[in-house]
Amino acid sequence: MAVDPNVKTLVDNRRARFEYDILETYEAGIQLTGTEVKSIRAGKANLQDAFALFRDGEAWLHNLHISPHDTASKVFNHDPTRRRKLLLHRREIDRLRGLVEQKGLTVVPLKLVLNRGWIKAHLGVARGKKLHDKRQAIKERQTQREIQRELKER
């Protein structure tokens, strides 16, 4: 996959790839206020516990923590953990809702990117990993590090 020079990763959810098997990915817009955009551009967002829910034919992102903007007054600042509307096509919402309801999967945000001036969320349709799967991933990562270390020493 070619790297697009117009796309810049602002916030990454590295924990999601460790705790879940990502089956599919989608890109969605997010309905944000001005102070939220400023905080995200400064990298002051946390995707750790965030997830998507589907209600009334709309997709909502819950538990996305965006810190209040430093220079804005408290009157104009936003609620850090309010739910935010995800902007997806109707077919995408219906497909994601079907996967979540039937197969017991979940939708988690993987990262927030700046794409041509717009903040987008990369969402992953995910299945939770079991404890032994997580241990296996740690073992594989350690063996890869050891192999790289050996190759570097040569």
From Swiss-Prot:
Keywords: Cytoplasm, RNA-binding. It is found in: Cytoplasm. InterPro entries: SmpB, SsrA-bd_prot, SsrA-bd_prot_CS. GO terms for biological process: trans-translation. GO terms for cellular component: cytosol. It comes from the Bacteria. Its main location: cytoplasm. GO terms for molecular function: RNA binding. It holds the Pfam family SmpB. Residues 134-154 are annotated as: Disordered. Required for rescue of stalled ribosomes mediated by trans-translation. Binds to transfer-messenger RNA (tmRNA), required for stable association of tmRNA with ribosomes. tmRNA and SmpB together mimic tRNA shape, replacing the anticodon stem-loop with SmpB. tmRNA is encoded by the ssrA gene; the 2 termini fold to resemble tRNA(Ala) and it encodes a 'tag peptide', a short internal open reading frame. During trans-translation Ala-aminoacylated tmRNA acts like a tRNA, entering the A-site of stalled ribosomes, displacing the stalled mRNA. Belongs to the SmpB family. This is SsrA-binding protein. It comes from Synechococcus sp. (strain JA-2-3B'a(2-13)) (Cyanobacteria bacterium Yellowstone B-Prime). The gene is smpB.
